[in-house]
């Protein structure tokens, strides 16, 4: 039986990022053979990947890439903010967005099937993802991407790694970059009021109607006369129009000059925005709220066989 030294364990940990005890066990099982120990860990790490797959990934990063008139924006999620700063994870995300630009995959499944080799993992994006899950110890998920490649000019802006914007435009590059930064700050949902989805408008209408009903109850309780149905309808419609102005890009007040709308700024710069995409990390994902005390109590109970 080979002697397992601290240096051997340290070297294996440096290569795999596996826990120290797992590295020592693998080296012992492999009788000191580093290559065999690494393979044994890969099997264990692969099992770890399947266990992690059900865990919520509400953290992560947004990344972008542009090559000529082709560009892409991608969101890849992990479980914790700590892992979102991991160099291996960040390199994987950038490799993925570069592949989107180069190969134009139809969806996440198609992207996952593309060739990729990283850190001895591969030969596909999916294989690398699973390998990194085992290495890092968290679930990782490619959530979404958007590719632009119709020949227009592209401006992109990343606010840290949590907000990313891609703008398709013709005209002035500086104005387009300013618009990308504006979008990250003000978060419009469409170019114009006419582009806002009917579902979103109906949700806002329901909110406005609910507010009107609450006001009517308060007026009644105070002994004040109720507003006519016509006035209530006008109030609701006014709320809708205000909402549409607030969420449509061209109608928003330009963040760098409150004397102009975005539309006015673009016109003065001779620039046309054809479309945009904005990703915010974890947007719409319900993040699990852990009750630490309850979790510890459950573990203690399990240990006692209760």
Swiss-Prot record:
It comes from the Bacteria. GO terms for cellular component: cytoplasm. Disulfide bonds: none annotated. PROSITE patterns: EF_TS_2. GO terms for molecular function: translation elongation factor activity. InterPro entries: EF-Ts_dimer_sf (IPR036402), Transl_elong_EFTs/EF1B (IPR001816), Transl_elong_EFTs/EF1B_dimer (IPR014039), Transl_elong_Ts_CS (IPR018101), UBA-like_sf (IPR009060). Associates with the EF-Tu.GDP complex and induces the exchange of GDP to GTP. It remains bound to the aminoacyl-tRNA.EF-Tu.GTP complex up to the GTP hydrolysis stage on the ribosome. This is Elongation factor Ts. The lineage of its organism: Bacteria, Pseudomonadati, Pseudomonadota, Betaproteobacteria, Burkholderiales.
